[in-house]
C-alpha cells in the first residue's frame, strides 16, 4: 500500500528544461509522466502544480522592466503551457487527467473548483492545476500550498533537483549536512530556502507536511510512495 492516499506534487518548471537549458525537454517530460503514472497505478490520488520558470518568471521579468502584474500574468500563462505539455505526455501513456486553471480559459482547461477536482481525483483522473492562484504576487509554491490544503492532500511532495534540505547550499558548501526531517519552526528560524515564506506559513498553519526530494532521478517518486526515506520531511 502506498504511503500516502492523496498527494499534491509540486514540479519545478526549470527542471523541465533538462540539459537543453530552455523550454521543455521531451525526454525529461516523458520521464516525469512515466513516474507519475507509476504511482497513479498504485491507487494514489494525484494533484499536480508545475512552475513556469523554464519559460518566464514574473519576478525576474519585473526586474527587467516588465510591469509586475503583467509579468506575473505571463508567468501564469507559462504554467499553463507546462501543464498542457504534461497533460499530453500523460495522455499518451494512458493516464487520464484534467487540466484545471485558476483563471477562466476554456477550452484550454477547466476553471478550478475544489469539489470538482476532488471528484476527478476520486474517479481516477490526475488533476493538473495551472495558472498559480490566479492573482499576481503569489509564487507557484504558494499556489501549491493553497491547492494542497484545498484538496485535503496528505502531503505536498516537492520534486526538486536536490535530494532534500541541507544546512546550507550543498552545491556551494561541501560541509552542508542533510536533514532527514525538520520542523517548520526550525526551517523558519534557520532561514532555510525550502519555499517562500507565504507558502511555508500556509503549510504550517494548516498542518500540511512537505516532502522534498530529487524528482530528476527516475524511480524516486515511487520510492517516496513506497516509504523509502530519500528526501527531507518538513512537519509541525
Region annotations inferred by a language model:
Residues 1-236:
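C-terminal catalytic "cap/lid" subdomain
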Amino acid at each position: 500500500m502506498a504511503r500516502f492516499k492523496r498527494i499534491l506534487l509540486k514540479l519545478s518548471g526549470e527542471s523541465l528544461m533538462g540539459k537543453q537549458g530552455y523550454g521543455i525537454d521531451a525526454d525529461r517530460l516523458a520521464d516525469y509522466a512515466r513516474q507519475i503514472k507509476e504511482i497513479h497505478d498504485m491507487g494514489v490520488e494525484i494533484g499536480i502544480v508545475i512552475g513556469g520558470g523554464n519559460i518566464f518568471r514574473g519576478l525576474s521579468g519585473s526586474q527587467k522592466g516588465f510591469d509586475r502584474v503583467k509579468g506575473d500574468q505571463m508567468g501564469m500563462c507559462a504554467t499553463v503551457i507546462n501543464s498542457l505539455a504534461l497533460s499530453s505526455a500523460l495522455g499518451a501513456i494512458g493516464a487520464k487527467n484534467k487540466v484545471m486553471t485558476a483563471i477562466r480559459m476554456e477550452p484550454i482547461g477547466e476553471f478550478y473548483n475544489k469539489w470538482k477536482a476532488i471528484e476527478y481525483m476520486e474517479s481516477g483522473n490526475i488533476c493538473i492545476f495551472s495558472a498559480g492562484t490566479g492573482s499576481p504576487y503569489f509564487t507557484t509554491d504558494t499556489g501549491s500550498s493553497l491547492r494542497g490544503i484545498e484538496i485535503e492532500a496528505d502531503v505536498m511532495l516537492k520534486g526538486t533537483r536536490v535530494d532534500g534540505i541541507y544546512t546550507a547550499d550543498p552545491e556551494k558548501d561541501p560541509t552542508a549536512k542533510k536533514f532527514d526531517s525538520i520542523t517548520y519552526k526550525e526551517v523558519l528560524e534557520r532561514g532555510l530556502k525550502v519555499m517562500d515564506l507565504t507558502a511555508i506559513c500556509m503549510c504550517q498553519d494548516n498542518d500540511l507536511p512537505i516532502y522534498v526530494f530529487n524528482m530528476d532521478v527516475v524511480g524516486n517518486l515511487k520510492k517516496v510512495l513506497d516509504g523509502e526515506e530519500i528526501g527531507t520531511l518538513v512537519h509541525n
